[in-house]
Amino acid sequence: MDVKAYMQKLGQQAREASRQLMVATTRQKNTALLNIATALEEQAETLKTENAKDLEQGKANGLDAAMLDRLALTDKVINGMATGLRQIAALNDPIGEISDMNYLPSGIQVGKMRVPLGVVGIIYESRPNVTIDAAALCLKSGNAALLRGGSEAAYSNRALAKCIQSALHESGLLPTAVQVVETTDRAAVGEMIAMPEYVDVIIPRGGKGLIERISEGAKVPVIKHLDGICHVYIDDDADADKATRVAFNAKTHRYGVCNAMETLLIADSRAAEILPGLVELYEEKGVELRGCEQTRAICDMKAATEEDWATEYLAPILSIKVVDDVDEAIDHITQYSSGHTESIITENLTTSRQFLARVDSSSVMVNASTRFADGFEYGLGAEIGISTDKFHARGPVGLEGLTSQKYIVLGDGTIRE
């Protein structure tokens, strides 16, 4: 196969479809989403049959149990995807929204209109449900989608693509509005991220290695986050019960997610009071603790190294550091944070405002678990990922994050004097 020619063709078709989607009505887009949901339910047995081929191949290739679990399309997963599509259909459509309309002395009206980005390329690993999530968010926001899933889910993704494209056709939209890259040749990724004439933005979802490779080679903007080194700081003026509850949840609610706490910071004045009980809870849960010298003087645990402060564990491991005050906590966060999510536990309004203003992460919280850093929890309905960059989107990327804006100017034969 000529991979370059294949990707160019997909890109051309996506660009053409994006022009139709740009002016599609909310009703058309919602109908398409609902039709995809119905197609998934009607084709559930076919989807499971194709998915079984991926699972069989995955076992032969030595994929571990966790990976196979993420790969599986069960009835529950398929029903969940259909439900998600219907939920996205129920969300407000951001496209065409007009804001900040002002009359100016020159006689013109100037405002902003929300518009799609165009063609969104999404590169991801393992989970075939991302195919549906990505397609749904792109369609609702008026974008064409070019999807490149992992080779381990090739059969599943092709089957899902058939459901999507038949539903698009039935809805009066171009089936090429959502295309799955069917070749497993890795050269396809290199071509996909180097087609600025056809692709407007790339969103990689997967491990750090994948995201770094995409970022380094892309010739189009990339929406991404590399790490989730999240912190919780227990302040001098923290409520002890709140501190214990939040710090425990932020670490133990789920380990392998980017918004789990990886480092706990605690003010020296509160360490001896709060740490013993909290450490006992962590140990009962099976969390391995690594502490600074002051922490280890209070509770017995492994010594933390310099590397620990800069590590996203994605595992039941936690680093703990005692700091003098909020200034030292912020300095530590500034040095080691990945810019994802940080939280302060305090009853002091002045300190909380200082923390909110000075901590430069995509989500900054007061008296809340870092586990809330999620598009659904933020009321966005769904998310395509989380961005720790400052352009174009930051934080959980929902429908609005997949849009841009243009200025609109209204006159009445108005000329510039």
Swiss-Prot record:
CDD domains: ALDH_F18-19_ProA-GPR. Gene3D superfamilies: Aldehyde Dehydrogenase, Chain A, domain 1, Aldehyde Dehydrogenase, Chain A, domain 2. One of its GO terms (cellular component) is cytoplasm. One of its GO terms (molecular function) is NADP binding. Keywords: Amino-acid biosynthesis, Cytoplasm, NADP, Oxidoreductase, Proline biosynthesis. The keyword Amino-acid biosynthesis applies. InterPro entries: Ald_DH/histidinol_DH, Ald_DH_C, Ald_DH_N, Aldehyde_DH_dom, G-glutamylP_reductase_CS, Glu-5-SA_DH, GPR_dom. One of its GO terms (biological process) is L-proline biosynthetic process. Pathway: Amino-acid biosynthesis; L-proline biosynthesis; L-glutamate 5-semialdehyde from L-glutamate: step 2/2. It is found in: Cytoplasm. Its EC number is 1.2.1.41. The keyword Repressor does not apply. PROSITE patterns: PROA. It catalyses: L-glutamate 5-semialdehyde + phosphate + NADP(+) = L-glutamyl 5-phosphate + NADPH + H(+). Belongs to the gamma-glutamyl phosphate reductase family. Catalyzes the NADPH-dependent reduction of L-glutamate 5-phosphate into L-glutamate 5-semialdehyde and phosphate. The product spontaneously undergoes cyclization to form 1-pyrroline-5-carboxylate. NCBIfam families: PRK00197.1 (NF001221), proA (TIGR00407). This is Gamma-glutamyl phosphate reductase.
